[in-house]
Amino acid sequence: MPKEFEAKFLNIDITSIKNKLRENGATKVHDPLKFYRLIFKRCEEAGDKPGFVRIRDEGKKITMTTKIFNDKKFPEEHEVTINESFEKGCEFLKAIGIQEKSYQETMREKWSHPLAHEITFDIVPGLPIYMEIDCTSEANLNKLVALLDLDKSNMKYGSFDKTYTKYYDIPSDNIIHKTPSLTFKDVGTQIKPNKNVSLFREITKLNKLIDERKMDTYYKKYKTLIYDKFLSETPGSESKTKSKNKRTRRHKKGRRNATHRRKSGI
């Protein structure tokens, strides 16, 4: 059965990575396109393996996909392109009794490379831009990661619900089962971050530019407000910094107490 050998890279310097892609033979397939998708639960008869069914409008085509997570890193995937509209695809799944879960919007810029099925830069409501590399084998994935000199500490697997957990400590279950809609216009009221609140606030402001189709302005402000200001450290660095500061304060307090004891003759 087909597997999807895919990895996400967070905290990316978009300009630098695109330059490396060009230097290593990659070409841009299309500029950012807005994707719309409706997520459905898999049939109960399919068993208890986690997964979903998706209808997605990719701007130039409509796809119907199912992903089955037998493997923590690389899910099993089956996908077909349908000739009917997005709405007709959704009607078909509802007609055969598959339950609708959520509606989601994303923006995607696609690149191609001989080692990859596709390389994408994804903009998801409320999240910093990340890159996804999708290959036909794990060996090709590792080769491309090395070729582009990507930071493996920022390499993540799985669907984007886990990315919300990484940046904002929002449980995956909240995104998968308790968020019926994720849109650029309203994400600020659709989910609530538990950390990195300032980052989330700035991202949601920028997301409104996407909804208004002001992509040039979005990218300029993203570089200044998000990458330079917030993403110099890995997701979760906020808590690491607090921990480091706490250790520093304990160390200084210990030194002061030792000095006091020496002066007091203790």
Residue spans for each PLM region:
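N-terminal strand-loop-strand beta-hairpin
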Residues: M1-A116, S153-F230, R247-R256
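Generic hydrophobic/packing signal
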Residues: R37-L38, I68-F69, F86, T120-I123, ...
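Conserved, surface-exposed functional patches that form binding/active-site neighborhoods
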Residues: I96, S102-A146
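Arg/Lys-rich, intrinsically disordered low-complexity tails that mediate electrostatic binding
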Residues: T234-G265
